[in-house]
Amino acid sequence: MVVSAGPWSSEKAEMNILEINEKLRPQLAENKQQFGNLKERCFLTQLAGFLANRQKKYKYEECKDLIKFMLRNERQFKEEKLAEQLKQAEELRQYKVLVHSQERELTQLKEKLREGRDASRSLNEHLQALLTPDEPDKSQGQDLQEQLAEGCRLAQHLVQKLSPENDEDEDEDVQVEEDEKVLESSAPREVQKAEESKVAEDSLEECAITCSNSHGPCDSNQPHKNIKITFEEDEVNSTLVVDRESSHDECQDALNILPVPGPTSSATNVSMVVSAGPLSSEKAEMNILEINEKLRPQLAEKKQQFRNLKEKCFLTQLAGFLANQQNKYKYEECKDLIKFMLRNERQFKEEKLAEQLKQAEELRQYKVLVHAQERELTQLREKLREGRDASRSLNEHLQALLTPDEPDKSQGQDLQEQLAEGCRLAQHLVQKLSPENDNDDDEDVQIEVAEKVQKSSAPREMQKAEEKEVPEDSLEECAITYSNSHGPYDSNQPHRKTKITFEEDKVDSTLIGSSSHVEREDAVHIIPENESDDEEEEEKGPVSPRNLQESEEEEVPQESWDEGYSTPSIPPEMLASYKSYSSTFHSLEEQQVCMAVDIGRHRWDQVKKEDQEATGPRLSRELLDEKGPEVLQDSLDRCYSTPSGCLELTDSCQPYRSAFYVLEQQRVGLAVDMDEIEKYQEVEEDQDPSCPRLSRELLDEKEPEVLQDSLGRWYSTPSGYLELPDLGQPYSSAVYSLEEQYLGLALDLDRIKKDQEEEEDQGPPCPRLSRELLEVVEPEVLQDSLDRCYSTPSSCLEQPDSCQPYGSSFYALEEKHVGFSLDVGEIEKKGKGKKRRGRRSKKKRRRGRKEGEENQNPPCPRLSRELLDEKEPEVLQDSLDRCYSTPSGYLELPDLGQPYSSAVYSLEEQYLGLALDVDRIKKDQEEEEDQGPPCPRLSRELLEVVEPEVLQDSLDRCYSTPSSCLEQPDSCQPYGSSFYALEEKHVGFSLDVGEIEKKGKGKKRRGRRSKKERRRGRKEGEEDQNPPCPRLNGVLMEVEEPEVLQDSLDGCYSTPSMYFELPDSFQHYRSVFYSFEEQHISFALYVDNRFFTLTVTSLHLVFQMEVIFPQ
């Protein structure tokens, strides 16, 4: 059986769908929420996993301790900051409490002052009415007594107004005594009743002031009437009354915030802004409880804020750390979250900083306000104390008038005087209680009172007598003192008319007024003494500075530093002339001057300045004014070791022995031996004025009659027209510290001394390192030998930057590969010895030398050029080799001329690496065969020398000398050095001696004249003797051997060829030139016998000089 169901109807289907939808909607919303939460959790989990993986990957475990430590420090820092903020809040609260209490106290004191001022003015008016009665009859008798009683009542009321509450018992006792006195007097009963009724009205004015000085701030058990303030001068305290329930520490903090300053401000300078009244203990407790109640919720709120802040700070720190890590690994998906968290952290920090600044500013304002109120309170308390003292003295004075001991004295003129005194006391009281803005009114009232007192009928004698016999009233006269001292310029009565007595029972001996009054009184008591002293000093005339200082030290009392330095110790018109030099007058050390002026000597110079010329003290600029027309020129070291008067002085004038010409800072490293200079100067006084060494006055010397000396001497000295350098320096300085400039040589000083001793008996010694040659006048000296002529630098030389003596750096070979150190002390000794031989005839000495030269070789003074000075007028022309052995006058001399026997020519240390090209030499010799006269090797000067009658010398001698036509190097050097130290420069050549002899024989046939005759003559002379060759000496040229024959051919060719490119120095023959046996050269020349036969007569040289240099 088949069952068939029909379809649902459309309505039923719709109903079912709607119901299903309604059921599923909340499930769908719930599922969506769950999905969102799950997605967020998944994201956070992914983030945490990513950070964990990164930390694990980069071994982040090592940084855990560091992270914890940093977070712990951060938390501790936050806690400290929060504690500091709480402390500031508590301090601010205490300041607020203090400010409120001070405001109330100020208000009460102001009110009391106002009431006291009104009462004192009414009392003053009452007494004025008594002093000037309209009806004379009423001023006598009973009416006067009543009026005086009324004045006493007013005075008592004033005392009550101005008295604090702790004096209430004393005031009541005083009032009882006054009542008894009034009852005893004849005053009617009605007056007493009226007075009592008026006294009872002062209830509010007699209320107590809150703060007590006698007990602690928390003691509140005593009744209200016993809690009073005592305004004492020494102890003024602004104690805050705090609740007993509040902690004692807080009370002490409130008390110790600010110390109360003493009474320093003016009593009349009262300007008040805030006013406050005193609080009783109950009121104080109420206020404190209210404040505590208000502050408790604030404190709880602050604590909660602190906890929230701490938690937020920790979270922010952690988020910042995570953000930094994510940023480091470029986690892009978390950028928004990172920015948000960092922005919150920065905003939080800015808010906290702004809050702290606000609290600090508020606290500062409260502090300023508290200080101002403290000062104002101190002034008001001082004013109240003074007014209270004045009112008591006035009250006692009126009581004395009311109860006279002798009735006769209370009548008449005496009564008028006492009433005038009472009026004066009342006026003084009004002044004490008045603020500054009432000063003008008080002055007008005072003027009126003074006029009334003058109009009274009291005779002058009684007033004077009364001034002497005023009864000793302790407190009133203490107040009287300050009435006259309160403005000595404002009061009409003189200060001296008041008799002052002091009692020490209750009040201090002097009333402390304003600081301005105290300072003015100090000025009054201190300044007149000084003024009188100044007047006496002005009458005596101007005092010297020393006396003035002594008088000031003896007479002027020691004041405060402020007054001591606020006035000039010397009158203004005396400052410029009487200030000593020890003051800041010569404060030139602030202007680059480091000198100490001899003050005593300068003062003595100032005293004598009127009668004689002012002597310039050392280190003074007055050196510019000195005149020295007759002073002879001293040696240069003396001349330049002292500052000249015409020098353009610098900013610092320094003593003589200083580095005035700081030449060691300007290319010079010399230390001047001043003691040696002084010794040298003393020696020069007995001699002729010597040439100032290294002086610029060499330019001014004239030698009109000097004949032409030997060219050597003429040219061996620097000309007067030389362009001298910038520096003149003494001998014994460190100028020639040549050991610092490439020096490696120490001269044999013993040999030098020995040579110097030998020179003393011979010709004139050559002053080494000296320029005094310019001063020696030798009018009859004939022309010297040619070698001497050419061995000296010409006057046309281009001199270098420094003109210096011979052995010095003048020929700065030391700066150009020179290594020798001069014995300067020995040079000075030689220089002094030369002065005794200055201008004597040198012919005798030369003749003696010539006689001695026959048996010995003439000594060569090393490092000297004075050989040029020897006169040999009759010397004949020397042999041609001697002619050529000297450098020609036409040589282009270098910048340096140097002595003969130095180690200048240690060319093995120079740049010699020469290998002679023998083939080139042979080729050059063959080319010469077709030319004119044979060119002697090592010489080019044969082309320039004209020798019409000179006999031909031996050819080997001719060639053994360097030519004068050579292109000379930078230095002219002596013969006997290590010129040919070629074995040290790896020159390993062997000369073909046979070839050289062959070439030499071929050249002998081409001489200008017949050289055979000369050689034959020389050979005949050489058979009997061999002339000695003194090594390292240029004087070989002076040995006379006129008949020497021609030398051997090997001697001829033992000299280097003329085509050699000569190095920087000409050197002596007897050097290590022939040390070729060390370099496998197998020829030994017989040098001692046949090489140096270079002696000729003097006549030959004279003839040669006349030919070459005709005059």
Swiss-Prot record:
Keywords recorded for this protein, A-Z: Coiled coil, Cytoplasm, Repeat
Comp. bias regions, Basic residues: 831-849, 1000-1018
Region Disordered: start-end pairs: 161-198, 451-474, 510-569, 829-871, 999-1033
Domain of life of the source: Eukaryota
Stretches assigned to coiled coil: 70-130, 341-401
Compartment(s): Cytoplasm
Gene Ontology cellular-component annotations: cytoplasm
Protein's UniProt keywords contain Cytoplasm: yes
Keyword presence, Nucleus: no
SMART domains xrefs: DUF1220
Olduvai domain mapped to chain residues: 165-259, 436-528, 529-600, 601-692, 695-750, 751-843, 844-919, 920-1012, 1013-1111
Tissue spec: Expressed in a neuroblastoma cell line.
Acidic residues biased stretches: 165-181, 530-539, 550-562
Remarks, miscellaneous: Encoded by one of the numerous copies of NBPF genes clustered in the p36, p12 and q21 region of the chromosome 1.
Family of the protein in this entry: Belongs to the NBPF family.
Name of this chain's protein: NBPF family member NBPF9
Organism: Homo sapiens
